[in-house]
């Protein structure tokens, strides 16, 4: 919003409180006497002109205040907005023509040629106030419909035509200052307080870490990456810069090329997924567990020796079920009945049985009951389980009595692991799939476990995998992502996001270890920070892919003015996206946005951009040659 007081117009951000506006205006006029005194001292001692004072980096307001006192007649002309506006409007077409002519001459001289066009005749003097137009009205003639900040930037080309020194440097400096005062820099800088805190002139640690990580991967974040545009205008300016001649398109293209390579390299690191590797890892690991349990059983068996052990529980269980079976008469399962009678005879023989023999009887009992049947008879399950459990109890009691209760507990665990290691570690369904996959070499069976949407399945097999198997499971997930994304960073981030959300994140947290998570998160952060490269209006490495015949035609039709405007706009955006400007913005002191104090801090920061922009302009022009 604009506020006029004592003949001077002040510009404040929309939404600024009335109290803050009043305070800022009071401070401004209260400081005029002090400032004028300081400037007067400069003048008395050195007799400096206003132009010379500008080189001392004295604020413009101070210069104008001093100028008013020294030249009251001229000052009254400057403060007459009608006179200034009239002069400015009359000079617009001549400023524009001079800007185009100077750009054409600059390009000609850059390739060793001479000046092609002379100075443009002006029937009316330019405005006395150097900021009368602020570049905005001129910019509208260069690129109609661009928007206020865009008009100000490209309008600076015309203003540069009337300044001493190098035309390109003047245009860049003017555009940078205009842009900073009301446009892209201001809007972007206001994002500093929203997520990036710059205290004591230093870049916030989290922002510095982001930039360091990205640059270590070969991706240089641009200003709009670290301070994303906050509204439609600034987003449009960013996009326009990517498509403009000599703009930021080449940088975005280089960014995207590096990002694609990062994704491709990451996906390639895990190699191809082979389901057999997972099967072999599981079976090998589980077999080693079974073998370890077998060694514990053998050790205890050897300690028990050949002394007879009690079989009381087993015999009692057989005596309980035999009468029930015998009552069935001819309907009884004869094989089950005979197996039980034979087992009782073995257990009650004279001299008894030792520990190893009782253990062997228990192992053979279930096989004898099943016989040649493909499926274990349902009616025999309860009886078989009852007798087996009784025999196990006799074995445990004998170990506890002969050795120790601790040895008995060790024996029970080893015995359970030996008999049920697959079912215990996995579960019956997974064990069945694993066994079938082992026999039939069908990867689909193990894939149903590896790609299961149930986190419990992954958690169950994970401890049973060795490092090779775990790498294979990670490769399985990365391979599936690779099938979808190719080398697209945007699709890669989408798939990683989906994986993190699957089963509440439990699968991701299980499959990817802390080290792998750290690597993936770092890559994801870099891709996220520079995601504008995915959707940018990218041009070729020369930055001129959009210089189509229509643009060339428009340039000739307007005496090179439209082309000059676009080149100037592109140069300004390249400088805005440069590292010096990016870092300067990130160092902007942390002040509440929308307040006069904040605007003053922003204006002070703008002063720093003048030499930065000039140097950056020179460097980047050499890059495009």
UniProtKB/Swiss-Prot annotation:
Keywords in alphabetical order: Viral genome ejection through host cell envelope, Viral penetration into host cytoplasm, Virus entry into host cell
Single biological process term from Gene Ontology: symbiont entry into host cell
Superkingdom of this protein's organism: Viruses
Family of this protein: To phage P22 gp16.
Function text: Component of the phage injection machinery. Required for injection of the phage DNA into the host.
Listed name of the protein: Putative DNA transfer protein p35
Organism encoding this protein: Acyrthosiphon pisum secondary endosymbiont phage 1 (Bacteriophage APSE-1)
């Amino acid at each position: 919003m604009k506020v006029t007081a004592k003949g001077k117009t002040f510009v404040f951000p929309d939404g600024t409180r009335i109290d803050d506006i009043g305070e800022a205006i009071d401070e401004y006029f209260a400081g005029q006497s002090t400032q004028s005194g300081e400037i007067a001292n400069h003048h008395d001692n050195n007799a400096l002109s206003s132009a010379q004072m500008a080189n001392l980096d004295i604020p413009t307001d101070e210069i104008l205040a001093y100028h008013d006192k020294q030249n009251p007649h001229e000052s009254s002309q400057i403060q007459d907005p009608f006179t200034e506006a009239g002069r400015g409007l009359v000079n617009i077409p001549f400023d524009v023509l001079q800007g185009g002519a100077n750009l054409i001459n600059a390009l000609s001289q850059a390739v060793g040629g001479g000046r092609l066009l002379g100075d443009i005749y002006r029937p009316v003097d330019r405005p006395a106030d150097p900021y009368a137009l602020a570049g905005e009205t001129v910019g509208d003639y260069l690129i109609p419909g661009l928007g206020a900040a865009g008009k100000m930037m490209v309008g600076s080309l015309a203003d540069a035509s009337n300044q001493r020194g190098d035309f390109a440097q003047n245009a860049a400096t003017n555009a940078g200052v205009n842009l900073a005062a009301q446009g892209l820099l201001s809007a972007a800088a206001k994002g500093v307080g929203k997520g990036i805190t710059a205290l004591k002139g230093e870049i916030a640690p989290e922002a510095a870490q982001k930039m360091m990580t990205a640059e270590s991967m070969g991706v240089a974040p641009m200003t709009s990456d670290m301070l994303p545009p906050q509204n439609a205008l600034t987003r449009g300016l960013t996009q326009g810069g990517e498509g403009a001649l000599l703009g930021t398109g080449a940088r975005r293209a280089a960014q995207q090329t590096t990002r694609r390579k990062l994704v491709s390299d990451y996906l390639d690191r895990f190699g191809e997924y082979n389901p057999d590797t997972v099967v072999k890892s599981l079976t090998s690991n589980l077999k080693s567990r079974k073998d370890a349990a077998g060694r514990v059983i053998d050790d205890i068996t050897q300690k028990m020796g050949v002394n007879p052990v009690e079989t009381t529980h087993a015999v009692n269980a057989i005596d309980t079920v035999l009468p029930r079976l015998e009552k069935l008469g001819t309907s009884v399962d004869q094989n089950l009945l005979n197996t039980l009678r034979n087992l009782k005879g073995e257990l009650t023989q004279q001299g008894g049985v030792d520990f190893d023999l009782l253990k062997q009887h228990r192992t053979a009992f279930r096989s004898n009951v099943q016989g040649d049947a493909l499926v274990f008879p349902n009616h025999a399950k309860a009886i078989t389980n009852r007798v087996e459990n009784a025999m196990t109890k006799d074995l445990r009691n004998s170990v506890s009595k002969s050795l120790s209760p601790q040895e008995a507990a060790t024996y029970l665990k080893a015995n359970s692991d030996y008999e049920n290691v697959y079912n215990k570690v996995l579960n019956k369904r997974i064990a069945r799939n694993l066994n079938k996959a082992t026999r039939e070499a069908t990867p689909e069976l193990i894939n149903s476990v590896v790609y299961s949407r149930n986190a419990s399945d992954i958690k169950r097999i994970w401890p049973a995998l060795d490092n090779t198997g775990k790498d294979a499971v990670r490769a399985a997930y990365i391979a599936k992502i690779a099938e979808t994304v190719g080398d697209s960073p945007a699709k890669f981030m989408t798939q990683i996001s989906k994986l993190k959300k699957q089963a509440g994140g439990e699968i991701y947290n299980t499959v990817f270890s802390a080290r792998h998570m750290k690597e993936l998160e770092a890559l994801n952060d870099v891709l996220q920070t520079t995601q504008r490269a995915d959707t940018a209006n990218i041009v070729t490495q020369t930055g001129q892919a959009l210089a189509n015949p229509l643009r060339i035609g428009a340039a000739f039709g307007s005496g090179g003015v439209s082309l000059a405007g676009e080149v100037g706009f592109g140069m300004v955006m390249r400088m805005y996206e440069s590292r010096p400007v990016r870092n300067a913005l990130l160092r902007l002191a942390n002040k509440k946005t929308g307040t006069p104090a904040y605007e003053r801090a922003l204006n002070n920061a703008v002063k720093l951009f003048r030499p930065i922009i000039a140097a950056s302009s020179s460097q980047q022009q050499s890059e495009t040659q």
